């Protein structure tokens, strides 16, 4: 029932059934009540850490949010130039948590559900002193040493879609504008996702379509098929849509299309037929620029 939940790592426990009550499991195998499990696997917890770390995270979050759902979006005085150049922004296309940090005032990004569904980034940034909710696809996670910690295939997963849907609904309830950075090639193809992706994608599509706050979408990479439609496209109500010059927008990824059209062909034929889609000569924003 809470909007955001934090959990202390050492002593915090959260469960419906105790780990030992789950058939075939005991706490030594998998502690389903731990902060790690609840943040990484279930997504019930937004942040974990020591008591001091949690209090610091809560302070950062509260500073981003309006006092209530009737107050205008949270503003504060800003000395960071809104039009400053982010020289390395294009290099952060894969890990959009870094990209959002770069564009935010004073490089402050308050990420929620950081450990869950890492292929989707959600959190709050400040732009010219105004709080903005940000949702972004992510294909790689880099650690502080600039090493790849996790890698994804650029598709939209069921967990990622639900994570984003819940966040967009919160932003809409509190009159917080939404920014999306889109780089998605399709839906995740796995047995786990196939059980849920249709419903999860519908939830995200509805969340964007139903939201009455300002919605801006920036296509920073691929934007293919129904997955792109789901990610705050013009078709579901985005107020403004922009695209980077190297963005690719189309009905389907060429390689995926080749697999469908040449289902009985060998791998070499599919590889040849699955050539990259031609990029448009002109990229138009929603206002025709």
Language model feature labels by segment:
Residues 1-289:
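Ligand-binding clefts of soluble mixed alpha/beta catalytic domains
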